[in-house]
């Protein structure tokens, strides 16, 4: 319910950051747009020194926190994930990938931002830019003028954190970079330039990025390179280069080819070799990458997201013997997998990556390092991560990606469809009351709306206010605190007191006590001050007795100006020293009574108080307060001590404190003590804490629990009471629970503020209380729209700042003619007007039929306690939708031979009668054909066909021309309105009525009968539409003897003796004679007694009358008499069985006839005149007399022709029977004939209903054709033609693209994909037709085979329903006390944005809306709603003065929110939305720190400027505007465990961002002080909200400065040398000498007595004497432990003489420290002189044997030279060098080649190196080993002549002081003569001198090669150090040969090489 508090606290905590710094090595970042033009993904790569961040070695995937500035006033913190950790070189790399959304732009606009990462500081050991700021930045281009695929991306680069380069050689490498978003056909055009960091001598090719660099120094450089693409986007690459010495060898073209070298300049005379930027003279063997498999730097490795790959291999090898290579990928993304394939001198790894995420997309430039443990090499790799053409397995079809399920083609299958998330695009979980984090980068989590919690946001964390009681919402308990809770949040339900329980825990001894001494240094006398100072340690001891292990101290002073100055924050161990250094300031009478304000200032100052410590300040003023202190000062003092929970203890020394006493009593807390003895005040300190009676409550401050509240607390009105004071007098642990802290809700309170208050105990801590209470809810107005005659579902909405569960009640309702609103249970809300509905209730709005006006209802919100102050409206907008016409079914009755008129009945809401048409093409053709069998259908005089257009108001005529039996003929039809919209199917039924026809009595029948008693006769009547008949005998003429009679039951048998005969007379009637098979027969009898034939003897005439009274014709039956005769019955001829086809009208003619053996007829010419009678008609058909006629065949004269007609549709068998009767009524037998009715194939039928769908229908509904076939055959339908603009699909969803096309399952659907491309008018209706042809699958072939319906036209109708406009919840940001012309977000696919309007439902509460063009028009309730609409850009919002988000309940805003809908030109509303106004407070940050600071003279002062957020502020930044500049002001950077690094501010203004606390350091100028010494002027700002200008005055407090000691010079007395200035602190003297040392002392303070100098510690060796100029040896008294003072000489200097112990030497032989002391006993810093007593190097010697120094031999014979020894008196334990060579006997010293003479001797222990070309051997070794080697020297000459053996010895200067060793080499040279004679038997033609001269000349050319041997030998002989002997080892007295010349660059090792003996 109160979660906003947590948010706010977190927000504030997040702002409290600290300025930290570390040793950064490398950095760069790239950027690229994501799925939105202004959503930019950044990839930041950084490298740091590991130990600056981690105490233990970190691992990959560990992280650190970094802050990044996006350049739009947004700074965010992210995790930098470690990607590479190098434990050897102490660095790591990390990558952070994050996204940022920049402000939106209008279409077509662009914007640029400079994003950057900045950090202090670079490392101090850099050769350039040391301690400089580190900043990498990039120009980020936001582009809303291009499609996403054309928006620019930044370049990308990379580097190793420390790039290895070789000192003194060319180091050429490329800055690897890629233009990562080149489009097809483009080429990279990157430009490379240096940033502000550039090593001296480094050059850069701006087009290629090639770097040329020859380091001139060994160490670390930094370089910054700016890489810019052709669009102006740039990135920064910043890295370190490490210049190291590498051993190498000179190029073969150099004179010293193969010689060991370290830099190019070591190689000389390299001939034609040009070593410039690309070639080196000094070469090294390095490891090398093997190409392939290693990709070359200009090659790219491509990976495709989601696709498998094999990665790539990297291989490296080395030729160095015994070394293996190691390959290290640097900074590769976390997903890379490294597999080691090969280890050894050659190493191979595989780098594999399966990128799966869209985040991986882009280009990477990474480095790989190979090392063989001696030398590192690098290579760069460019990696491109591509999106697949269609990601996630999709494929492209006609330019569109067809994606797997749940992926969208709009993103080329890279993103999920709505409602799916993650890389596999699975469905998001249920999210009931929130928004799911969907999309491929989403995590599927449900982010809950306010008031809901749980994974699916289904659990309400709200409750009704009515169920709430006052109580604790949350509390914070701190176990170590004396008072708990330390923080509490309380909900106040009413104005009843609510008690808060307080727990007090006081341990046996207070665990933590902090005591801060505030001492006034303006004591009357120095003695008083010294007494305070002397007792301070004792006072500490007394307090420590209270809690021996846990007391901390601090110290502040009231200075000579009466101002507070903090000398030592808590905890400090040096408060006594701090006060000693401060000294007494001297009495200042002007500061009387200022201790109260100084104490207040001290209480407000951050002094380092520890959390959970008892806090006390001991105030020792010089004077009492004024008699009547200013009340405001007392209040300020009281509130400051209450707010910080500090217990004041005031101690007066020799002064009355009555006014202090009354002030403490007025405050209600504290203690005071008076001491008449300045030395005894220490005793009162402890009692002030315990056992004192001089306190407000009579006991010590530690024993009082005193509750107080700051008078300025904002929530004071909510506080009803605080606990009473609690005395604690027990020494054991006390735990008590206190009551008395109570709160209540004031009757009148500001409902928009939740105030806080702090209740404190004095010393023991505070309770921070946050109050909450209920606020009225607010109903949210909104609008909904629905289509005409459609429903809309809605829920009521409201907001509540307290997150209460809301219910709602309607306050107005709809009328029955407007519409109906029902609940989810179907209840009309107007029937329960006082019902409260839950917020989850769903209502259904149903407008009255065809109601189109706008409607609204009102409702209020209720939170269980309070009802909203006002109601809100729900506005209903009904979208007019063209309604289809409605047709009606009807029946029309027709009569035979009559004409009837009728109309198709239809109505339409929009159209009048003239516009409503009915098209006969919508009448089923088979129905029309059926009707035409019975009559004629005409319209306006013309026959109705399927092409007839019928208007509603014109009658249709039907004349029934046939008189069938009653039947109904349907006409199925549809109506169509003027828009082409069709109705549903209706039926107009034609009731074909049968008109009754009179029966037919059989007429003209003659019967010939013999004389008999009774002959049967039948009177016949035929009638097809009657059930019975009445036979009426019209006339009877029975002849003379005849009688016609009948029987009573109409069934006479005409046999004799019938007793029921009734004679027939005229007008006799017979009724209820039934028709059977359309025939009715009245049997009668005729009897006569005539003996002879009489023609026309009798007759009977009759009629038959049907059921309806129609009388037939008059029929007469004539009786001929033939008298007595016999008669033979006739024989009937059988008709053979035959067959006919189904539904054919008549068969062929058939005849009933027979034969008669006698002549029956009275008239002979009529002999055999038989009567044929159908005795049993067929059951499934009829017999007719005339083909295609309608007269039923019953009987007739034979031969009787008839035709068989089967009943419609019947197939099978049928039969009929027949006989013939002769004239005597003799009947033949009855025969029957069977007819086979053969089935035929009938034409199938299809009915196509009008297919209707709308723009809101979504995918088309599948429609199935209505087919039928009389024969039961399958009907197969095909599409013959397709509609235009509308796409047709089969029932599988496959589009039908070509015709004819069979329809599977005879089903289809339609879609119209994009209404914007409808022609000629987009977003309009489309009416079109298609045609279907259906065939059956009959197997019949005769008389007809397969039949079709023919092409039947179908109609498809797409009706475009105006789409509601859209809008989004949006937010407008502005600043407090400003206004903004804003735009509503609205769009409509049918309309131009300029045509859209805004319908407002509500107005802002805390601001106003006005028209932008006329600010005087302020909107009121009367000007909104209804027909009042506004343009999207028409309004301006202005918040009330001083109002901002800070004035909302949770301070987070928004300040205002209004509801609205967008209205399109057709009046359709969008769903309602809200626009909120986030009014950023213009409350600037606040500085609450000191405006005056006191700085000790010559002391660095750490100045922390802390700012508080202004109300509603977001950040605190600082801008130092100016600094007066007498001292130095620096930004102080925390370097972690390395302490602080101060960086001097050189330019103003100086700005810092991203923290709330900023560290500076102030350093006063040396030895200057004074009040108002410097001024610091600054502002705090929050983005563009700027505070007032703050000033900090710096007072530099004078502190007695220690004097300074200065070492001036020295003079070696024994040598009468001149005075030598002491450079640094070192003096060099020789063994057995003495030295005079001169020192000087100075003091910046004014001294009244001279300074005193002393030797503070006597040296361990040697003696020190004072100087006595009158003594012959200058020695005065010895300076020893008895007296270490040095007498001051008359010239103002002090002199001492140092004499080392006889015969002893050594570096750092003695250390003599000097100090001077001023009159106040302040001692200077020690100045120590270091004395080196050096030995004296002695000359080495060479001894040639005394016998002879000439040796004679012969050519090619060995001469042994002996008796040569060498000696160096002072080379006992160190080596010396020896060169033995043979030169000619002239004065020259050119060494002879081996081709002339050879030289050798035993090489025992020494390290010797014979030259390969010359007679020369170089050795280094001890005297003993060298003498052993040259005891015998062998010489063999191949040419006779005179030679000299030359020996050169160098003592290497080891016996000289190390500092002058290079200049102290001593050497000696000796010669031995050698004469080589030719053999005696040999004749020599050439002069020896000539030969020898030639040989020598030839050898001269190779003299330079000697150096190679010398270097190699010396190199191998060098001690194992980081340097080596150079040619200085051979310096001597030989100068004629170049090989003996002194090197100008000689140097030697600082480590003595031990002799090898």
From Swiss-Prot:
Record-level GO cellular component terms: membrane
- The region annotated as signal peptide is 1-21
Fetch the InterPro entries from UniProt.
Answer: EGF-like_dom, Ig_SibA-E, Ig_SibA-E_2nd, Ig_SibA-E_3rd, SibA-E_N
Q: Where is the EGF-like domain?
A: 421-458
Pfam families in alphabetical order: Ig_SibA, Ig_SIBA-E_2nd, Ig_SIBA-E_3rd, SIBA-E_N, vWA_SIBA-E
Q: Which residues form a coiled coil?
A: 520-547
Q: Which PROSITE patterns match?
A: EGF_1, EGF_2
**Cystines in this chain:** 431-446, 448-457
What residue ranges lie in the Cytoplasmic compartment? 1912-1957
Regions that span the bilayer: 1891-1911
> What topology does it adopt in the membrane?
Single-pass type I membrane protein
Which of this chain's residues carry glycans?
Answer: 112, 255, 276, 298, 313, 324, 406, 588, 654, 661, 750, 991, 1188, 1266, 1368, 1528, 1591, 1632, 1646, 1670, 1680, 1756, 1763, 1775, 1827, 1867, 1888
Q: Which GO terms describe its biological process?
A: cell adhesion
> In this protein, which residues make up the domain named VWFA?
514-705
Q: Where in the cell is it found?
A: Membrane
Ordered alphabetically, the record's keywords are: Cell adhesion, Coiled coil, Disulfide bond, EGF-like domain, Glycoprotein, Membrane, Signal, Transmembrane, Transmembrane helix
Q: Which family does it belong to?
A: Belongs to the SIB family.
* Job description of the protein: Implicated in cellular adhesion.
* Subunit structure, interactors included: Interacts with talA/talin.
Name of the molecule in the record: Integrin beta-like protein D
Lineage runs: Eukaryota, Amoebozoa, Evosea, Eumycetozoa, Dictyostelia
């Amino acid at each position: 319910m109160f979660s906003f508090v947590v948010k706010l606290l977190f927000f504030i905590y997040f702002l409290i950051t600290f300025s930290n710094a570390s040793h950064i090595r490398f950095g760069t970042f790239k950027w690229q747009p994501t799925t939105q033009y202004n959503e930019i993904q950044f990839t930041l790569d950084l490298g740091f020194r590991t130990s600056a961040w981690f105490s233990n070695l970190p691992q990959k995937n560990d992280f650190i926190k970094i802050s990044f500035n996006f350049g739009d006033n947004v700074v965010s913190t992210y995790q930098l994930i470690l990607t590479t950790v190098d434990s050897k070189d102490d660095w790591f790399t990390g990558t952070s990938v994050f996204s940022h959304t920049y402000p939106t732009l209008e279409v077509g606009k662009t914007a640029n931002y400079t994003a950057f990462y900045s950090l202090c500081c670079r490392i101090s050991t850099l050769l350039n830019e040391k301690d400089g700021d580190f900043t990498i930045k990039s120009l980020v281009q936001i582009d809303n003028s291009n499609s996403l695929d054309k928006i620019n991306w930044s370049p990308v680069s990379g580097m190793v954190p420390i790039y290895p380069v070789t000192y003194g050689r060319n180091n050429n490498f490329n800055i690897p970079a890629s233009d990562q978003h080149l489009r097809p056909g483009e080429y990279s055009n990157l430009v490379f330039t240096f940033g502000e960091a550039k090593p001296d001598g480094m050059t850069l090719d701006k087009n290629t990025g090639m770097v040329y660099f020859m380091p001139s120094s060994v160490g670390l450089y930094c370089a910054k390179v700016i890489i810019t693409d052709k669009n102006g986007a740039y990135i920064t690459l910043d890295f370190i280069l490490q210049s190291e010495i590498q051993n190498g060898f000179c190029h073969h073209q150099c004179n010293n080819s193969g010689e060991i070298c370290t830099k190019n300049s070591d190689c000389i005379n390299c001939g034609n070799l040009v070593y410039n930027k690309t070639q080196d003279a000094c070469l090294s063997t390095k490891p090398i990458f093997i190409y392939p498999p290693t990709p070359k730097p200009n090659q790219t490795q491509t990976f495709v997201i989601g696709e498998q790959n094999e990665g790539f291999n990297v291989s490296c090898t080395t030729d160095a013997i015994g070394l293996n290579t190691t390959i290290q990928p640097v900074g590769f993304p976390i997903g890379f997998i490294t597999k080691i394939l090969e280890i050894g001198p050659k190493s191979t790894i595989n780098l594999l990556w399966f990128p799966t995420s869209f985040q991986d997309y882009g280009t990477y430039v990474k480095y790989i390092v190979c090392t063989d443990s001696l030398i590192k090499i690098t290579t760069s790799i460019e990696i491109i991560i591509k999106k697949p053409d269609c990601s996630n397995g999709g494929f492209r079809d006609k330019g569109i990606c067809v994606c797997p399920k749940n992926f969208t083609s709009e993103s080329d299958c890279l993103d999920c469809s709505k409602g799916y998330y993650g890389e596999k695009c699975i469905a998001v979980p249920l999210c009931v009351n929130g928004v799911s984090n969907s999309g491929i980068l989403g995590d599927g989590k449900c982010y809950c709306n306010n008031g809901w919690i749980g994974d699916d946001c289904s659990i309400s964390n709200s409750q009704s206010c009515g169920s709430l009681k006052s109580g604790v919402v949350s509390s914070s308990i701190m176990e170590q605190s004396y008072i708990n809770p330390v923080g509490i949040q309380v909900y106040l339900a009413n104005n009843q007191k609510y008690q808060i329980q307080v727990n007090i825990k006081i341990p046996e001894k207070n665990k933590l006590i902090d005591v801060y001494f505030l001492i006034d240094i303006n004591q009357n006398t120095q003695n008083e001050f010294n007494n305070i100072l002397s007792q301070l340690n004792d006072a500490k001891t007394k307090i420590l007795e209270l809690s021996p292990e846990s007391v901390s101290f601090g110290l502040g002073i009231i200075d000579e100006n009466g101002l507070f100055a903090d000398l030592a924050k808590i905890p400090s161990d040096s408060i006594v020293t701090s006060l000693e250094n401060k000294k007494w300031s001297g009495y200042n009478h002007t500061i009387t009574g200022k201790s109260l304000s100084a104490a207040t200032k001290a209480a407000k100052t951050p002094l380092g108080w520890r959390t959970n410590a008892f806090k006390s300040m001991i105030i020792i003023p010089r004077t009492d307060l004024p008699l009547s202190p200013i009340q405001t000062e007392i209040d300020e003092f009281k509130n400051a001590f209450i707010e910080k929970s500090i217990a004041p203890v005031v101690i007066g020394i020799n002064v009355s404190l009555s006014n202090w006493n009354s002030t403490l009593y007025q405050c209600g807390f504290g203690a005071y003590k008076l001491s008449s003895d300045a030395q005894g005040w220490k005793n009162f300190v402890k009692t002030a804490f315990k056992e004192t009676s001089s306190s407000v409550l009579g006991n010590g401050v530690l024993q009082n629990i005193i509750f107080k509240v700051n008078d300025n607390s904002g929530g004071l009105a909510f506080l009803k009471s605080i606990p009473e004071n609690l005395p604690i007098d027990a020494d054991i642990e006390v735990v008590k629970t206190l009551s008395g802290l109570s709160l209540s809700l004031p009757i009148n309170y500001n409902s928009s503020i939740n105030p806080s208050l702090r209740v404190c105990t004095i010393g023991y801590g505070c309770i921070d209380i946050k109050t909450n209470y209920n606020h009225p809810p607010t109903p949210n107005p909104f609008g909904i729209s629905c289509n005409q005659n459609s429903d809309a579902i809605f829920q009521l909405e409201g907001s509540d700042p307290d997150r209460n569960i809301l219910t709602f009640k309607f306050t107005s309702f709809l009328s029955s003619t407007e519409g109906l609103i029902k609940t989810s249970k179907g209840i009309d809300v107007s029937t329960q007007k006082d019902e409260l509905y839950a917020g989850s209730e769903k209502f259904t709005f149903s407008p009255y039929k065809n109601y189109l006006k706008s409607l609204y209802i009102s409702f209020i919100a209720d939170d269980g306690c309070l009802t909203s102050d006002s109601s809100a409206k729900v506005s209903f907008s009904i979208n007019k939708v063209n309604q289809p016409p409605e047709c009606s079914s009807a029946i029309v009755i027709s009569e035979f031979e009559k004409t009837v008129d009728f109309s198709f009945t239809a109505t339409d809401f929009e159209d009048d009668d003239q516009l409503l048409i009915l098209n006969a093409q919508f009448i089923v053709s088979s129905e029309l054909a059926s009707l035409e069998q019975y009559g004629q259908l005409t319209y306006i005089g013309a026959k109705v066909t399927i092409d007839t257009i019928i208007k509603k108001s014109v009658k249709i005529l039907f004349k029934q021309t046939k008189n069938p039996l009653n039947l109904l003929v349907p006409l199925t039809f549809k109506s169509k309105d003027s828009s082409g919209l069709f109705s549903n199917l209706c039926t107009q039924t034609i009731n074909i009525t049968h008109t009754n026809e009179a029966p037919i009595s059989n007429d003209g029948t003659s019967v010939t009968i013999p004389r008999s008693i009774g002959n049967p006769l039948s009177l016949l009547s035929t009638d097809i539409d009657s059930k019975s008949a009445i036979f009426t005998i019209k006339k009877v003429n029975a002849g003379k003897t005849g009688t016609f009679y009948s029987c009573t039951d109409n069934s006479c048998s005409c046999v004799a003796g019938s007793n029921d005969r009734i004679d027939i007379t005229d007008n006799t009637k017979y009724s209820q004679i039934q028709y059977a098979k359309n025939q009715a027969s009245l049997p009668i009898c005729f009897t006569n007694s005539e003996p002879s034939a009489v023609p026309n003897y009798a007759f009977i005439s009759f009629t038959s009358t049907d059921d309806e009274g129609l009388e037939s014709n008059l029929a007469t039956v004539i009786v001929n008499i033939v008298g007595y005769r016999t008669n033979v019955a006739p024989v009937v001829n059988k008709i053979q069985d035959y067959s006919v086809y189904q539904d054919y009208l008549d068969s062929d003619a058939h005849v009933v006839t027979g034969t008669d053996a006698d002549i029956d007829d009275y008239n002979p010419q009529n002999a055999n005149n038989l009567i044929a009678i159908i005795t049993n008609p067929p059951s499934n058909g009829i017999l007719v007399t005339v083909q295609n006629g309608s007269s039923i065949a019953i009987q007739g004269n034979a031969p009787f022709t008839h035709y068989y007609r089967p009943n419609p549709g019947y197939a099978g068998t049928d039969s009929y029977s027949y006989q013939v009767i002769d004239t005597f009524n003799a009947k033949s037998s009855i025969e029957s004939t069977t007819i086979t009715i053969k089935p035929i194939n009938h034409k199938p039928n299809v009915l196509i209903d009008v297919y209707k769908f709308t723009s809101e229908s979504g995918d088309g509904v599948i429609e199935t054709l209505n087919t039928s076939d009389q024969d039961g055959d399958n009907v197969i339908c095909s599409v013959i033609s397709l509609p235009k603009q509308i796409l047709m699909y089969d029932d599988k969803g496959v589009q039908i693209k070509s015709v004819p096309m069979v329809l599977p399952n005879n089903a289809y659907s339609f879609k119209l994909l994009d209404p914007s491309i409808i022609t000629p008018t987009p977003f309009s209706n489309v009416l079109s037709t298609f045609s279907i042809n259906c065939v059956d699958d009959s197997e019949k072939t005769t008389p007809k085979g397969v039949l079709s319906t023919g092409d039947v036209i179908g109609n498809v109708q797409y009706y475009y329903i105006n789409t509601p406009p859209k809008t989004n919840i949006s937010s407008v940001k502005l600043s407090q006390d400003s206004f903004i012309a804003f735009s509503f977000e609205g769009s409509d696919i049918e309309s131009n944005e300029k045509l859209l309007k805004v319908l407002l439902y509500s107005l802002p509460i805390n601001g106003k809306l006005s028209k932008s063009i006329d600010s005087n028009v302020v909107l009121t309730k009367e000007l909104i709603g209804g027909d009042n609409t506004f343009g999207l850009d028409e309004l301006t919002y202005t918040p009330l003065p001083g109002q901002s988000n800070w004035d909302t309940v949770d301070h987070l805003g928004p300040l205002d929110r209004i509801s609205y809908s967008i209205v399109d030109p057709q009046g359709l509303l969008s769903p309602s939305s809200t626009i909120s106004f986030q009014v950023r407070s213009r409350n600037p940050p606040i500085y609450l720190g000191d405006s005056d600071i006191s700085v000790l003279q010559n002391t660095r002062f750490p100045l922390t400027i802390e700012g508080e957020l202004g109300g509603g502020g977001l950040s605190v930044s600082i801008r130092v505007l100016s600094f007066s500049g007498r001292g130095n002001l620096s930004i102080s950077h925390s370097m972690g465990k390395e302490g602080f690094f101060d960086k001097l501010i050189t330019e103003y203004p100086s700005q810092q961002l991203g923290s709330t606390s900023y560290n500076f350091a102030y350093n006063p100028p040396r030895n200057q002080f004074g009040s108002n010494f410097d001024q610091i002027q600054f502002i705090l700002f929050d983005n563009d909200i700027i505070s007032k200008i703050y000033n900090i005055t710096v007072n530099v407090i004078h502190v007695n400065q220690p004097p300074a000691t200065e070492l001036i010079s020295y003079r070696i007395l024994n040598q009468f040398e001149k005075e030598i200035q002491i450079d640094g602190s070192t003096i060099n003297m020789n063994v057995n000498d003495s030295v005079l040392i001169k020192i000087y002392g100075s003091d910046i303070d004014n001294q009244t007595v001279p300074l005193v100098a002393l030797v503070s510690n006597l040296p361990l060796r040697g003696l020190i004497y004072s100087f006595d100029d009158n003594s012959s040896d200058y020695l005065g008294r010895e300076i020893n432990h008895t007296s270490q003072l040095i007498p001051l000489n008359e010239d103002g200097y002090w002199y001492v003489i140092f004499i080392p112990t006889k015969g002893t030497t050594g570096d750092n032989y003695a250390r003599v420290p000097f100090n001077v002391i001023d009159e106040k006993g302040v001692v200077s810093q020690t100045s120590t002189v270091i004395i080196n007593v050096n030995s004296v190097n002695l000359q080495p010697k060479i001894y040639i044997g005394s016998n002879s120094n000439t040796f004679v031999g012969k050519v090619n014979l060995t001469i042994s030279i002996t008796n040569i020894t060498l000696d160096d008196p002072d080379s006992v334990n160190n080596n010396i060098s020896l060169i033995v060579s043979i030169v000619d006997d002239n004065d020259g010293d050119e060494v002879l080649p081996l081709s002339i003479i050879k030289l050798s001797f035993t090489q025992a222990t020494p390290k010797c190196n014979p030259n390969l070309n010359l007679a020369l051997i170089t050795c280094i070794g001890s005297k003993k080993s060298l003498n052993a080697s040259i005891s015998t020297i062998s010489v063999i000459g191949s040419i006779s002549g005179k030679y000299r053996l030359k020996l050169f010895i160098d003592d290497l200067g080891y016996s000289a002081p190390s500092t002058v060793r290079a200049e102290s080499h001593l050497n000696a040279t000796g010669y031995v003569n050698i004469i080589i004679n030719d053999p005696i038997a040999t004749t020599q033609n050439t002069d020896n001198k000539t030969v020898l001269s030639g040989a020598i000349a030839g050898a001269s050319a190779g003299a330079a090669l000697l150096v190679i041997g010398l270097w190699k030998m010396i190199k191998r002989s060098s001690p194992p150090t980081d340097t080596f002997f150079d040619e200085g080892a051979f310096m001597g007295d030989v100068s004629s040969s170049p090989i003996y010349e002194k090197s100008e660059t000689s140097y030697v090792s600082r480590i003595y090489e031990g002799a090898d003996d």
